[in-house]
Design a protein with these regions (language model features):
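Low-complexity "stalk/linker" and mucin-like segments enriched in Ser/Thr/Pro/Ala/Gly
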Residues: 60-70
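Extracellular receptor-binding modules and their adjoining Ser/Thr/Gly/Asp/Asn-rich linkers
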Residues: 1-45, 72-75, 80-105
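Short acidic, gly/pro-rich beta-turn/loop elements at beta-sheet edges
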Residues: 50, 63, 87
Length: 105
């Protein structure tokens, strides 16, 4: 897992900062009808930040269910296997967007 690209946009009126970029995840195998959270380092994220992710593609049966800040500089992406068999997902590039408000902006 690695951050490939990173950019920042500032909103001086509302005091928000938006960071964006890409990262890759090579998820562990998921059993049928289960979900798991993959974590990765994303420098600068903090508790209270909003995280949005969008995979550029996914292995059939996998669903990117959501993302969150799990700790300082760390995000978690929850993947769900919707199939009745296990799935070993391929490495996938994700686009991300982090919104920071107030003092962190």
């Amino acid at each position: 897992m690695a951050v490939i690209v990173k950019g920042t946009i500032y909103d001086g009126v509302r005091g928000a900062k938006v960071e964006f970029g890409t990262f890759t995840i090579d998820p562990a195998s998921l059993n049928a009808a289960t979900e798991a959270e993959e974590t990765l380092t994303l420098d600068g994220v903090a508790s209270g930040d909003l995280v949005f992710v969008n995979p550029r593609s996914l292995t059939a049966g996998l669903l990117a269910k959501g993302a969150r800040v799990t700790a300082a500089d760390t995000i978690g992406v929850t993947l769900r296997n919707e199939l009745t068999t296990s799935v070993n997902g391929a490495s996938v590039t994700y686009d991300y967007l982090v919104v920071k408000f107030g003092g962190d902006a």
